[in-house]
A protein has these predicted regions:
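Alpha-helical transmembrane segments of multipass membrane proteins
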Residues: 200-201, 229, 309-311, 355, ...
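Membrane-interface "cap" regions at the ends of multi-pass membrane proteins
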Residues: 16-77, 91, 95, 106, ...
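Hydrophobic, membrane-embedded alpha-helices of multi-pass small-molecule transporters
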Residues: 45, 49-64, 69, 191-198, ...
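Membrane-interface loop-to-helix entry segments
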Residues: 153, 187-241, 253, 271, ...
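C-terminal membrane-solvent junction of multi-pass transporters and transport-like membrane proteins
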Residues: 184-187, 199, 385-394, 431-481, ...
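TM-loop-TM module centered on a large, flexible mid-protein loop between adjacent transmembrane helices
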Residues: 112-123, 155-165, 246-250, 262-263, ...
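Hydrophobic alpha-helical segments and their helix-loop junctions in multi-pass secondary transporters
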Residues: 150-159, 219-248, 267, 310-316, ...
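Hydrophobic transmembrane alpha-helices that form the core helical bundles
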Residues: 69, 82, 91-196, 201-204, ...
Length: 510
């Protein structure tokens, strides 16, 4: 990321178009120091903590609430194909993250990578656009976990699902009229906001304490997943799981558009294997820890997702998941699976475990994303206040509190309306740039110190690029989300140029 506090890269490389190799190599060193000296952060995260932080970020409430959406998109249990292809895409993308994270173990992840790969000029601009889109997408991602938590609590207390106020806010988007955004207020909204506030309070501690607590959260996440998987497998019906409707795999236009929509949702659920990259300055022996954490977390979560979805589809008719049998099954599918097998009390226990899982994801998201504004501020590419570090806990406390506050506000939104737009924005302004970037960096700086080199190069980034492009263009009405992403790009570009002109920076100065 552009500014992880490495001023020598920004200054010494201006006239070359690329950072000097000596500066880049320093990023790949497996420093043993307990403190990342130019950032004031403590390297206190080992491999177990890194894996648990990645996994609780990846799983969250997503697979428990999006399974019906994938089944609806693909019109049957062939939805498992979306999860399989999603796992392949996550693995290819994860290998790219592993190489970049091991070579540049700094706070902020993608911000640092884009800044370094594309040089002090284009890199500074692209990394600013990344920060700009993250200002929207990060709080929305965190808020989605909070809303999902409140949704599952509604299985225990249905009053939480009441809506006292709703409003449809049309957001103008050039060429596609409007992007609908639903604002909802009810008891569940307050619960979602409280979830975000509690997570921020628990993160307001040193990184060693935060990592230890993440291990405890990981145990609850595994409990929720295994409870549903084992229940489904013990009450499994092959006819339900593999009762494909006629023409399920006919290679028609409907099949490919449904697969694109399903793959988009699966990609959303696999997000998070890169969480440890945002915490690179706080990882011990990052050249080994970061790649291992990514590979292990992607592999374990892929297996869990496939088992979870197969077991659910083998116990509940897929027609129920598409809305033909009421909202309770769709909104609380994991709890319903266990309730039908072992009774109401067992279902309530699983609902609480899913709530635990949702909170774990919010905890991990807040932790990782709070390091990105901090990294940008260190590089003088964001508000300087976010560069502050708590004098005792050694954490970027201002960035953490800001992100938590904005996320609480976004809890009033019905976030399902924006999931597709958020995925498209991330693909255009982060994932595709990194897939291309890892190949650019191989060509421009072949001597760069790479503690981990992605396997089967260049196949993983090429497969990931193909998968992301398929998600972008295969779905009906895809132009709406793409134009929305372009609006984000245009507004970010205007702000960047205004700042650059005032500061006499590129393209208006040195």
């Amino acid at each position: 990321m552009e500014g992880c506090g490495i001023p020598h890269l920004a200054n010494n490389g201006r006239d070359m178009g690329h950072p000097p190799l000596s500066g880049i190599r320093s990023l790949g060193l497996r420093g043993k120091d307990p403190v990342a000296k130019d950032e004031g952060l403590v390297r206190g995260i080992g491999l177990p903590g890194a894996i648990s932080l990645n996994m609780i970020n990846m799983i969250g409430v997503g697979p428990f609430v999006t399974l019906p959406l994938i089944v609806l998109a693909m019109h049957g249990p062939q939805a498992i194909l979306g999860w399989l292809l999603g796992a392949l895409l996550a693995a290819c993308d994860g290998l790219v993250w592993a190489e970049l994270g091991a070579a540049m173990p700094r706070a902020g992840g993608s911000y640092e990578y884009l800044r370094t790969i594309y040089g002090p000029r284009a890199g500074r601009f692209l990394s600013f656009l990344y920060i700009w889109q993250l200002s929207f997408s990060a709080p929305l991602s965190i808020a989605s976990g909070c809303v999902g938590l409140a949704q599952y609590l509604g299985f225990l207390w249905p009053t939480l699902r009441k809506v006292y106020f709703s409003y449809q806010l049309p957001i103008p988007v050039p060429f596609v009229h409007t992007l609908p955004l639903s604002i909802l207020l009810g008891p569940g909204t307050l619960v979602a906001m409280l979830c975000c506030a509690v997570a921020a309070a628990l993160l307001y501690r040193n990184i060693q304490s935060v990592t230890r607590f993440s291990g405890l959260l990981w145990i609850g996440v595994m409990g929720a997943m295994l409870a549903v998987i084992l229940t489904g497998l013990l009450h499994f019906h092959w006819r339900l799981a593999f009762g494909f409707p006629p023409g399920a795999f006919a290679l028609s236009g409907e099949f490919f558009t449904g697969l694109g929509a399903g793959l988009l949702i699966a990609t959303y659920d696999y997000w998070g294997a890169y969480n440890i990259n945002f915490l690179g300055a706080e990882v011990r022996d990052p050249g080994r820890t970061i790649p291992r954490a990514i590979v292990w977390s992607v592999g374990l979560v892929a297996v869990l997702y496939l088992l979870l979805n197969t077991s659910v589809l083998g116990t509940i008719p897929w027609q129920e998941l598409t809305g033909q049998a009421g909202a309770n099954t769709r909104l609380s599918v994991a709890a319903v699976v266990v309730e039908r097998a072992y009774g109401r009390m067992a279902g309530e226990v699983v609902a609480l475990l899913v709530v635990w899982t949702a909170f774990s994801s919010v905890y991990a998201l807040l932790l990782g994303y709070s390091r990105v504004p901090y990294a940008a501020a260190l590089d003088n590419n964001y508000f300087r206040v976010f560069a502050r570090v708590h004098p005792r806990h050694r954490i970027p406390n201002i960035s953490l509190l800001m992100l938590a506050g904005v996320s609480m506000v976004f809890c009033v939104l019905q976030l399902a309306d924006l999931v597709a737009a958020l995925v498209v924005i991330r693909i255009l302004l982060q994932f595709l740039l990194q897939q291309v970037g890892v190949m650019v960096l191989r060509r421009t700086h072949p001597e760069m110190d790479r503690p981990f080199r992605l396997w089967f190069y260049p196949l993983p980034p090429l497969v990931a690029i193909a998968g992301f492009l398929y998600i972008l263009f295969s779905r009906p009405h895809f132009t709406r989300e793409i134009f929305f992403a372009l609006v984000v790009v245009m507004t970010g570009t205007i702000i960047y140029l205004w700042r650059a002109q005032r500061r006499r920076e590129w393209p208006f100065g040195a």
